Amino acid sequence: MHYPKVYDVIVIGGGHAGTEAALAAARMGRQTLLLTHNIETLGQMSCNPAIGGIGKSHLVREIDALGGAMALAADKGGIQFRILNSRKGAAVRATRAQADRVRYKAAIRHTLENQANLDIFQQAADDLIVEGDTVKGVVTQMGIRFDTKTVVLTTGTFLGGVIHIGLEKSSGGRAGDPPSIALSHRLRELNLPVGRLKTGTPPRIDARSVDFSVMTPQPGDFPSPVMSFMGDVSMHPEQVSCYITHTNEKTHDIIRGGLDRSPMYTGVIEGVGPRYCPSIEDKIHRFADKDSHQVFLEPEGLDTHELYPNGISTSLPFDVQFELVRSIRGMENAHILRPGYAIEYDYFNPQALKFTLETKAINNLYFAGQINGTTGYEEAGAQGLLAGLNAARRAWDQEQWTPKRDQAYMGVLVDDLITLGTKEPYRMFTSRAEYRLMLREDNADQRLTPVGREMGLVDDVRWAAYCEKMEAVETETARLAHLWAAPNNPMGKQFVEMTGADLSKECSAIDLLKRPNINFTQIAELTGSQVSTQVGDQIEIAVKYEGYINRQHEDVAQLKRLEETKIPADFDYDIVSGLSREITQKLKTVRPETLAQAHRIPGVTPAAVQLVMITIRKNAQTKKIA
């Protein structure tokens, strides 16, 4: 059958990339079709039941700032919220939400089903209609042809997916779901650069068989943070604790004894796994000097006893999984509900993409998510939104858009993928961003919401809330700048009494806030401020980090001017503070002549280039003084 409706955008896949892609295109007014093999699994959390974390929550906030669904779904489904790196600087603070799988998925599905311009159809895609070098349509498993102007492919782990438990293997996109074999073959016919990656998941545990009394409870933060700029604590369901236990030498001996039946260590799995989320087999091999590893027992939801033991992802045979689980303190009688497994799947070298996530070989075909070599819901969602908005703009012959590295973590993600490529699953960290003080969680809306509004991604309600917030920030900052505390006036005396700090001369409330040990809550109490916590936090960060932020803006401008800066032939990379051993060795081997050349060396990060630039500048200043 030839379906009568012609779409602007067709999105294949209903995971985290696909849902954000479809929602973005539909919000922009494009006629959009989301093809999924199973409507019941839209927005499903296939691995760990959590959203956010270091580097990742920055992406979630950026998705949210552009009108995406992930952050609000996390607020509606989150059963524990924590601020990570809370004692560190604002640039690296991150929000993490432990999610109820069912509630999160329900929130995503509700958003999809209530989005104007978006049709959903349950059917696997088997073929792409390509005429010349341009995609024109999609053919489903039962032979239905859908015509479209653009296609966004978000296949996750389904392309040629193979599940491994011990030396047994079976076809699957994830446990219980079939793989996408026909589409995998079709993409290989298009001569796109394909490779294999792998990821894994731990066995799931019945909480009723666990002794929590010997474990360390890990409660959420109070007051509870929110993930979305539009979020509110009232959205949160009941909050619960996670629990921490550890592996031990007995656990490690059991694992070592099973390595001869491990698909990873017998060469059965060829795909490369995620470096920063290794299996327990990898951990005891790579960190042989450690006699224990943390295991976080995370509830899968409020209406289930199922636990996710974060830290023991494995593809060992089930009998070994059974023994290793029961060797862990508090889990001596644990009942496994589902075995852990590894999954191997196709991905395509992201260097074959444009910065808009459109393939270079096939016009109007966009890739997003794990198909590009990334790992993580947040990385997938960010790519999905970018691919969706660019497919939507291409459908109406509008200019494509990708944020720069100094504008968003999304920009860092895309630039890393396209410039460097990847041979292992790519995960976002704050350390990948050289301008991270400018790319904080709290200001994602300032950086991106106005851009999103221009492109039609941000609705009236979100835009009004953003404008109200920014007006409050501006008004309150101006108010505090005109409130003065002096040693002998009431405000000054109250400040000294309240904080125990010295006050030797007159200064504004803004100047008081600049002090290291003074926070906005104290200033609010002192001055009678009525603004929200979100507004207060934004003001405090802007005030305290003003000098550093201004310096980083200067660095952005200077790095652009100095892209062709010469590196002295005898430059000593060993004196560059903060440069990793791996990057130092690469620079010593290649000996780049310019910063631009250094930037192009695979594995040399923009942050490393900036460190080299700063050292060159310091050396030049030292020579001038001498």
UniProtKB/Swiss-Prot annotation:
Pfam families membership: GIDA, GIDA_C_1st, SAM_GIDA_C
UniProt cross-references to InterPro entries, sorted A to Z: FAD/NAD-bd_sf (IPR036188), GIDA_C_N (IPR049312), MnmG (IPR004416), MnmG-rel (IPR002218), MnmG-rel_CS (IPR020595), MnmG_C (IPR026904), MnmG_C_subdom (IPR047001), MnmG_C_subdom_sf (IPR044920)
Binding site for FAD: 13-18
Residues holding NAD(+): 273-287
Cleaved signal peptide residues: none
SMART domains to which the protein is assigned, alphabetical: GIDA_assoc_3
Protein name stated in the entry: tRNA uridine 5-carboxymethylaminomethyl modification enzyme MnmG
Gene this chain is encoded by: mnmG
Organism of provenance: Acinetobacter baylyi (strain ATCC 33305 / BD413 / ADP1)
Any GO CC annotation of this UniProt entry: cytosol
Keyword Chaperone attached: no
